[in-house]
Amino acid sequence: MKQQKINVNSTPGFKVIKAWLASKKRKPFLFQQQTWEQVIAGNSGLVNAPTGYGKTYSVFLGSVINFINEYPKDFAAKKNNGLQLLWVTPLRALAKDIGRAMEEVITELGMQWRIGIRNGDTPISERQKQKTKMPEVLIITPESLHLLLAQKGYPDIFKQLKIIAVDEWHELLGSKRGVQVELAISRLVNLQKDSMVNSQWLMENNEKKKQQHINSAPQPINNSTIQPLNHFPSIWGISATIGNLDEARDVLLSSLNKEGIIIKASLDKKIEIASVIPDEIEKYPWAGHLGIKLAQKILPVIEHNKTTLIFINTRGMSEIWYQQLLTVSPELAGVLALHHGSIERELRTWVEEALHAGILKAVVCTSSLDLGVDFRPVETVVQVGSPKGVARFLQRAGRSGHQPDAVSKIYFLPTHSLELLEAAALKEAIAESFIESRQPLLLCFDVLMQYMCTLAISDGFYPDKIFKEIKSTFCFREILEEEWLQLLQFITAGGIALNQYDDFKKVEIIDGLYKITNRRIAMRHRMHIGTIVSDAMIKVKFLSSGFIGVIEEWFISRLNPGDVFTLAGRNLEFIMIKEMTVLVKKSNSKKSIVPSWMGGRLPLSANLGQMLRRKLNEASDNENFPEKEKELSALKPLFDLQKELSAVPKENELLIEHIETKDGFHLFVYPFEGRLVHEAMAALLAYRISKITPITFSFAMNDYGFELLSDQPIPVDDSNVYELFSEENLFADIQKAVNASEMARRKFRDIAVIGGLIFQGMPGEKVKQKHLQSSASLLFNVFAEYEPNNLLLRQAYNEVMYQQMDEVRLRNMLQRIQQSKIIITVPARLTPFCFPIKVDSMRENLTSEKLEDRVRRMQQQLDK
């Protein structure tokens, strides 16, 4: 379908907005003007522009211009216009900031529009107000949007809707929350189609009745139940740069079944990247200790900038960094804050407001401040440790200089010396715009099952109609009719395996309409709409006063009364657990346990891995060593030692090291493909070697390579190495190598929760984690035995293969290795490359203090 084009300059709305911008001594950017033209033409698409250049205004002001064009004479006076713009955002923290920016525009234009926010933090009273009188703009999370679809009479909410905007679409794409957005859009788009059909029917029916009653008194026609939408809502995504923008657009607009456009700003955001180089480069590096020792080096950065964000990859490490900065610089007390997802919401909100006000010098944070929050006082960002991907590093850099023409400044602080190689790789990747793609998810049956029940507790649904809608989404375009029928059977009768249990017969069929009428089932479902399944979180509270934050159940279960742990930057003594709340008191102890949260370790992205291999290619060149690159230059002593003992692999080479120590026989392999792929590869290689000779292994891995350790020589040599790394029989071998059924069992817990098979409990009375897992295991066993073709069971295995083990990337790696030269060396001792992997293998059995002592002794012996 050809895109309509309208000259926006001549419209009344544009003239009003242009005058408003001029009053602030600003002009619209070309990409904003292009977006406004497309918005007022009723087209859909994706906006891509650098951070700080007004992506939000590109779509929001398009909506305002639309409205002014519709009511040029009285746009300022018109009230209660119904929901015009639905703004979907992935983070609650973003909602307040976006709402503030929109309110400012509306107030200065003198319009009567109201900006509403709806998420888990919205008070019930505010939600009730919205129900009776919707604001013109509603900023909402995917979960809260599905809760709206769960209300009876929800079509009335959207009858005036003109635009659906999805902010930070690159963050939602490739996640189950993104699938939620796809499904919601399919419903909202089809509400309009329903309305058009109803309108046509109404017109034809009116005409018939006129003919029938032409010679008698006219009869009133009751059309109160038919309230047609006035338009076709256009859909706009707002996205940072990713490697597959075209696909991102197609996924978002799939339900429209018409071509969309990409509006890409031709603006280059200036980014300054500087590495914090240690005074002394360790030739035997190891992860996790160096960063803290470099804390002193970022004090001048904090001092010379208005506000600095210090990004740490895990919540546990952010607690350590906060304490360390206060130790090395006590004068930061009062102007240094901590922000992560487990700190109580009120404290997080205070930190965000203080950032806006510019009263903080620095904030130690995690990904909780990753996304587009506009903190203008932030002048500099420090990234501690590997960001694991190019896009994430760019995103974090963009938190500084968050306005047009400002420079984004970011410092890379390594947690071990080899990470300086990543700094060099990141610089080159950004210079070449070599940014990761976000792969969309397919056939998420757990999300679909939840969505079907959501529709069933509102007005119900007719299967044939909803099936067509669902097939219009990108995620479910390949769904088969037999799969759809299996889902319908499951929600109405419990499927084949569970048809004896009434708890799984949630949906009734009333004259062909699928509907949930049981109030208890409906209430439980509403409470657990969403796809974010985390380990059970328990609130932490002072014995005498307020809440501090939340901690994971598994961590608290290991503590004894009197143990001291750190949360929200405070040392706390554990007293007891009472009514699912951890009671604590302040502790003056200098020693404490720092919580670690599950899932804290992200894998290295394929793009960054590729760039690392390219940088190694440069480092391996003795004649043309890149002395001008200060990161590689600083690492030269390490590379020289690696070459002396073993080799530095080129881009088209794979290095394997055989090393014998008192611990046994080690095999180290360096694909530079990230922890998850290495974990799968280690298991696969071990399985294939065990078919050659009976042998047992222990594994260790990091983002650069992996280790197999055995008590006997490991039979890998030039005669069999290519065969061992073959992609032949990969699927079958990996299933046997990793105990796929046990991994699928663990995945199934989350799938069962999202799909509504397991109830997580009432607020404040959450079901314990071990009980959830045992319930999920029981269901898994039942399906495996009595319903092996169950869709949720199949999904669990698919998620293990294609997400957890990244089978596609593993296969690509094996194909690359087949084209590479494999270098096998036999170093006399541990090398700089294998040392961090060796240290990682010792972590599980040693405390951090004992580990540091052991590593120091090993380094001294190796340096002799």
Give residue ranges: language-model regions.
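Short, well-ordered loop/turn sites that connect or cap secondary structure elements
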Residues: 532-534, 559, 566
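A conserved acidic, glycine/proline-rich C-terminal tail/linker
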Residues: 545-564
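Short, solvent-exposed secondary-structure boundary/capping segments
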Residues: 578-595
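Short beta-strand-centered aromatic/proline hotspots
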Residues: 570-577
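Helicase motor core with emphasis on the C-terminal RecA-like subdomain
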Residues: 2-10, 15-19, 27-34, 40-53, ...
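Extended, highly charged accessory segments
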Residues: 467-470, 474-537, 551-552, 595-596, ...
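Acidic, Ala/Val/Gly-enriched low-complexity intrinsically disordered segments
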Residues: 197, 204-207, 217
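Cationic, low-complexity basic patches in intrinsically disordered or flexible, solvent-exposed regions
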Residues: 201-202, 211-213, 220, 228
